[in-house]
Curated annotation (Swiss-Prot):
Disulfide bonds: none annotated. This is UPF0262 protein mll6455. Pfam families: UPF0262 (PF06793). It comes from Mesorhizobium japonicum (strain LMG 29417 / CECT 9101 / MAFF 303099) (Mesorhizobium loti (strain MAFF 303099)). Belongs to the UPF0262 family.
Length: 161
């Protein structure tokens, strides 16, 4: 991919389904950071898209499925992928539980305890990110860092829903 192609194969806007509602301040902070980081640096290319990016992404949940609605910069629809949440459900649940422990720990635990929880949290996050990459394989090409940030947003949607 040339330098010009790389700057076009990216997301410039992320929208989460706001109809689900808001979550805890900690979760909302994770959402805001993930969106900011994702917009700043990402690699995102719908497979077989004959047009060019950059792209806008709307993430939502519909009937216990994860919906990736991809559009061009001008809002023209490119593709919508609907993925089952089943492969991610256990990881998201475990990740949510360990995040709650982490948020509790940063308020009252020792640095070594916080570090131990954070290592587990990062491991689960990596597992979820890889699962998401696998689920998007053949649909949307993303790199691992993009998958990590998208996994955070999937978790936020799931926690709200």
């Amino acid at each position: 991919m040339t330098g010009s192609d790389q700057t076009r194969a990216k997301l410039i806007d992320i929208e989460l389904d706001e109809s689900i509602g808001r979550s805890t301040p900690d979760v909302e902070h994770e959402r805001a950071v993930a969106i900011f980081d994702l917009i700043e640096e990402n690699s995102f290319q719908p497979v077989n898209d004959s047009g060019a990016g950059p792209y806008r992404l709307k993430l939502s949940l519909a009937e216990q499925r994860l919906v990736f609605a991809v559009a061009r910069e001008d809002g023209t629809a490119v593709v919508t992928h609907i993925l089952s949440l089943t492969p991610l459900r256990r990881i998201v649940k475990d990740y949510y539980m360990i995040c709650e422990s982490y948020y509790d720990a940063i308020r009252s635990s020792t640095p070594s305890h916080i570090e131990a929880i954070d290592m587990g949290r990062r491991g689960l996050h990596n597992e979820g990110s890889q699962t998401l990459m696998d689920r998007l394989s053949g649909k949307i090409d993303i790199d691992f860092d993009t998958a990590r940030r998208l996994f955070t947003l999937v978790c936020v949607l799931h926690w709200r829903g």
